[in-house]
Amino acid sequence: MTPTQPVLLDLFSGGGGAAKGYMDAGFMVIGIDVEDHCRAAGRIGFEFHRMAWHEGLEKFGDQADAVHASPPCQRYSRASACWPGLAAQYPNLVGPVREALEACGRPFVIENVEGAPLHNPVMLCGSMVGLTTTMPGHGKLGLRRHRLFEPGGGLLLAPPRTQCDHTLPTIRVFGHGRPGNSELRGPGYAAACREAMGVWWMSRDELDEAIPPAYAYWVGVQLMQHLRDLAGQR
């Protein structure tokens, strides 16, 4: 890290999937989460503080050049929709987070699952950024893991140049890195999930809700250029 690096505040940072991608794009990252992810932060080298998202935004917002937020996705997920009343048990934070980020006055990105109430988001799929793995007995597998990214605060995201390609058999990363009812069973499943996601440092529990660093890198490259453009206008 260098003093000239732009600072990105990563709210709901979890196991550091987004943080790693933004770091690879050139940002210094400050991670905020109510759960303890000091181990992950230490392994990949970003600053971490255990606190609520709004406390982190209040304390570190002025230091940040940009903000990324990944509010809890369970309320909007397909799995929750399968059980009547389950979604309502989870917090609905996309709206409050957006309002707070707009008030912060920094370029921002809100990430969530398909079905979340995001404004004009860009969707990324593992096939768009070449995320694959191999598993004994199953050969080459592709990662789908569709995620939405809403830009705000003046930031615009160009759509991906490639479309989804679900030709390969899919490795599904859910259930805390365990195969569950998936047809992919046996030794090496969790390791294959980590390889497909590009998150070698994560625990099984962190895998479930993480985004691949490649997604955040794709966003981060455009965010970095946006900040350069803003600096050139001053």
Which residues does each PLM region occupy?
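Phosphate-coordination loops involved in phosphoryl transfer and adenosine-cofactor binding
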Residues: 3-5
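Class I S-adenosyl-L-methionine
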Residues: 11, 33, 45, 54-66, ...
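SAM cofactor-binding core of SAM-dependent methyltransferases
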Residues: 7-57, 68, 76
